[in-house]
A protein has these predicted regions:
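Short beta-alpha connecting loops at secondary-structure transitions
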Residues: 209-211, 239, 267-275, 287-299, ...
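Catalytic alpha/beta core domains of metabolic enzymes, predominantly
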Residues: 216-350
């Protein structure tokens, strides 16, 4: 048995009155984004990226649109140091991108960091020390005053070296393990650092309040953010930043609520990479904003390519249900879901809708480089007529009547059920063609001639079980006349219950598709389909196919 008595909440709620953010129902603009993939993400990999891989990843982040990129902890390893020097010396940092470097508040590490970053066109020096109760007591064995001294000593050295080294430097301070720190004490430490750094509106400083470990529900963190928003000094000269992790599975919620509460900047990783359960997912955050009509200022229009590069370089797998990015996130197997999606797509097309409102799909898959045929409607034993019909129409142009879709659906689901697998669009087409299209055994129409005398007179040459027979009959139209001729020659008892047709292609050589449903004397219904450049021939082939399905 598990023993819950060994656990208790380890966070520090703020006093009442710091929850005005709850009146807001959505984030109205994108934050400043900072990718920490090359530091937090890289340090969490089983095999960290090589120099060449980091360069490729950096270029991908730039292409996506990140304007701030944490490129590493240059004092931690030669690879991290050389990566930063390569970016600077080979002039690989675009004019609108600022690199960020991480350093602990320790003299020799700060000095090594400035050695690495000298000559950078723009760089954020991100210095930090841990402030939580657990870290103070168990790791550092220091008092609050001593921990604050570490922060202020670090700030003094950072400020001093920024004046000695060549470069354009901005500054960021993080009270690491903020979520396990008394919030008033965290503010006290941050304000002491701000007093040293003396930010101004035109040279602001970043104060980053990390969810180093998720310890509370997201609204508790949002209240803490609002408290800091109200109590930090130099507020018009401070960029309030958040850095959520995902230990409780609510990293995205933490970031969103923090933005409602005053956070202006988010540090994040692609696909939620990072220590333990990962950092907050930049893709989910950005595309969730996008789904509310907010420009995220990040370009994920070719998300499959980004996914492929990420998986190759990091050797990590993107889970199939990862929001927006996973292989199955737009997939509908359920019959009722497929039917609603198919109808939603049809409604959108018929009404020329610009705003996206399709059931079950939060954003248009095309916007992020996904396709309807491969990503949305997926066929297995749970699928329904709507989805199966959608696959045939989207991929091959066949717009089956609803009742025929239902009949085909039973065949398709049976094949999937017995084979215990998902069916491709090609396999669905094969089942349709083999079961309904242009069937010529045991009955076929060899030729038919028509004359308009007291209606339509058809002279039809039939082949039944290899025997030919010529029959003449009258009907209200050509197809009715042929049907009457077949019944006269064979004694079959059926009624033309359903007929529809449409063009499969465009142009003078386009093919027509026809569908026929027959109601038989015993109450059963059979279906057939025909295709031909001559619409009359297509209709006759559909009729014959329906007869042959009896």
């Amino acid at each position: 048995m598990m023993d819950a008595t060994k656990y208790a909440p380890g966070y520090y709620p703020v006093p009442a009155g710091y929850d005005s953010w709850v009146k807001k129902d959505h984030v109205e603009k994108a934050p400043a984004w900072c990718s920490v993939d090359l530091r937090d993400g890289n340090q969490a990999l089983i095999v960290p990226m090589s120099l060449e891989e980091k360069l490729e990843f950096f270029q991908m982040l730039v292409k996506i649109g990140f304007k701030e990129i944490e490129v590493g902890f240059p004092a931690a390893s030669d690879t991290e140091y050389e990566f930063l020097r390569t970016l600077i010396e080979q002039d690989m940092i675009p004019e609108d991108v600022t690199v960020q470097v991480l350093t602990q508040c320790r003299d020799h590490i700060i000095r090594r960091t400035f050695e690495a970053v000298k000559g950078a066109p723009r760089a954020v020096i991100h210095f930090y020390n841990s402030t939580s109760v657990a870290q103070r007591e168990q790791v550092f064995h220091k008092s609050k005053e001593e921990i604050q001294q570490i922060a202020t000593d670090g700030a003094k050295l950072v400020k001093q070296l920024s004046q000695e080294y060549e470069g354009n430097f901005l500054f960021e301070y993080s009270p690491e393990s903020f979520t396990g720190t008394e919030v008033d004490y965290a503010v006290e430490v941050c304000n002491a650092v701000l007093d040293i750094m003396q930010p101004t509106p035109d040279r602001p400083m970043i104060i980053n309040l990390p969810v180093t470990v998720e310890m509370s529900m997201p609204h508790v963190y949002a209240n803490q953010i609002e408290y800091c928003d109200k109590h930090l000094k130099y507020r018009d000269s401070v960029i309030l930043s958040t850095h959520p992790h995902n230990d409780r599975g609510t990293g995205v919620a933490c970031a969103e609520l923090a933005m409602l509460a005053g956070a202006q900047r988010v540090e994040c990783c692609l696909f939620g990479n990072g220590e333990r359960t990962g950092n907050v997912d930049a893709v989910t955050l950005a595309l969730t904003l996008y789904s509310h009509g907010v420009d995220p200022k990040l370009d994920f229009s070719d998300l499959p390519e980004i996914c492929a590069t990420y998986e190759r370089v990091t050797r990590m797998h993107i889970y199939e249900r990862t929001p927006y990015a996973g292989q199955l996130v737009f997939a509908a197997f359920s019959g009722s879901h497929q039917d609603a999606i198919a109808k939603g797509m049809a409604y959108r097309k018929e009404h020329g809708e610009h705003r996206w409102t399709c059931p079950y799909i939060p954003i248009d898959p095309h916007d992020i480089g996904r396709t309807y045929d491969a990503d949305v409607i997926r066929i297995n034993s749970q699928s329904g007529k709507g989805g199966i019909g959608f696959v045939l129409e989207q991929n091959y142009g066949y717009n089956l009547p609803p009742k025929m879709r239902e009949a085909l659906g039973y065949k398709v689901k049976s094949v999937s059920d017995h084979s215990h697998k998902e069916l491709s669009a090609g396999e669905v087409l094969r089942i349709f063609e083999e079961g309904y299209l242009n069937k010529t055994k045991p009955l076929s129409v060899v030729e038919a001639h028509f004359a308009q005398v007291n209606g339509i007179t058809a002279t039809v040459t039939l082949a039944l079980n290899g025997q030919c027979k010529v029959v003449t009959s009258v009907g209200n139209g050509r197809l009715d006349a042929v049907a009457n001729a077949i019944q006269s020659a064979t004694g079959m008892d059926f009624h033309l219950e359903n007929y529809s047709e449409h063009s499969l292609d465009e142009g003078s050589t386009s093919r027509a598709a026809s569908y026929v449903g027959l109601l038989w004397g015993d109450g059963s219904v059979t279906w057939g389909a025909g295709t031909h450049t001559d619409i009359i021939v297509a209709g006759i082939q559909a009729l014959v196919s329906a007869i042959n399905n009896k």
